[in-house]
C-alpha cells in the first residue's frame, strides 16, 4: 500500500539526507585533494581499530600482533566501501518507500536492485524511475571511485616504503638515531667514513616527509598501512632520522651538515604534527622549548657511548650538548610518540610507550665474526 501523503515528506527527507551523507563522505575521501573531515569514514576507522585491538591484544608476541594488524588497512577500505553502500542503500530505500506499492520491503528490494545494478526490480511511475536511475548511478560511481582510489594509495605506499627500506641498512632494524650515525661513520665496516653522505640523506628525508605529510593527511587510511617487515615502521624510521639530526647538531656542530639537518628536522616534525592532528591528537604546532623530553640523560649517554665505539667525531661534552639535543627533540617527540602508539609501531629504542606494555627492541646487529650489516 502506498504511504499516505503525511508520511511521505519525513521519509523522503530522511532518505535524501542519508544519500547526501554517503555522497559527501565519498567525495571528501576519494575526490577532494585535501583533508576534509568525514565522520562516517572516521567512525569506520575507529570501529575497525577497536576490533583489531580486541583481537591483537590477546597475544603477547609482538610478531603475532603485527601479523594481525597487517590486514587492518584493507579492513578499513572494505569497511568504508560497505558503509557508503549501506548508507546510500538505506537512503534510496526511504526515498522509494512513499511510492512502493508493497510497503517498505518493496522499497528496499527496488533500492537494492538499482544500487547494486542487478536490475531485477523496476518500479512503476516517473518519480520512482528517476530515483532508481540515481541509485544505479550512485552505486556504480562509488565502486568505480574506490577501484580507481587503490593505485593512488599503493603508489604513495611504495614511495614511503622505498626510503624506509634503504634506511634500514644504515640505521638497523628497528631503526635508531644513534645507530644511524654510528653505522654511517663506520661505513658498514669498510673503514672509510661516509659521513659526507648525510647531507644527501637529510635532503631525501626532507622530501620524504613532505610527500608523506601530503599523502597521509589527504588519504588518512595510508596511516594504517604497515611496513612489510614486522620490525620495520615508517614512523620509527622518521624518528630515527630526526634523532640523528638532533644528535649530530648537538654533539658535532662543526662537522654536522647544519642546513640540511635543520631543514630535515623542520620538515619531519611538521609531517608528524600534521598526521597526529589528522588522528585527532591535540599536539601544539610549536611546543614550548622548555617542555622537556621523556628521555633521560643516562639514555643520552648510552647513545654517545654507541657513537664513541666507532670513533664518531664528538666535538662537545655530552653535558654541554644535552640541552641542545632536548631543544630539538621537544619539537617532534610528542607527535612521534602519539602516532607510533596509535599505529602500534615496533617499540624501538627512544620511541615511547605503547598501548600494551612492551620492552624496547634494540636494532639488530651482526653476530661477532660476521661482516657488519
Annotated model-derived regions:
Residues 58-76:
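Cytosolic juxtamembrane amphipathic/interface segments immediately preceding
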